[in-house]
Curated annotation (Swiss-Prot):
Protein keywords: Ribonucleoprotein, Ribosomal protein
Protein name: Large ribosomal subunit protein bL34
GO cellular component, one term: ribonucleoprotein complex
Record-stated family: Belongs to the bacterial ribosomal protein bL34 family.
Alphabetized InterPro entries for the sequence: Ribosomal_bL34 (IPR000271), Ribosomal_bL34_CS (IPR020939)
GO molecular function, one term: structural constituent of ribosome
Species of origin: Thermobifida fusca (strain YX)
UniProt xrefs under Gene3D superfamilies: 1.10.287.3980
Gene Ontology biological-process annotations: translation
Superkingdom classification of source: Bacteria
Amino acid sequence: MSKRTYQPNNRRRARTHGFRLRMRTRAGRAIIAARRRKGRKALTVSH
């Protein structure tokens, strides 16, 4: 039996999908804008 692939880690989660990482690229900023337009309560996992 292989180990489970999801090993939760808050720091890794924020660094991979966090707000500052999203703002770094044009595509990431587009994601934030789309989520704002849609009215998402949480824009990113860290924000």
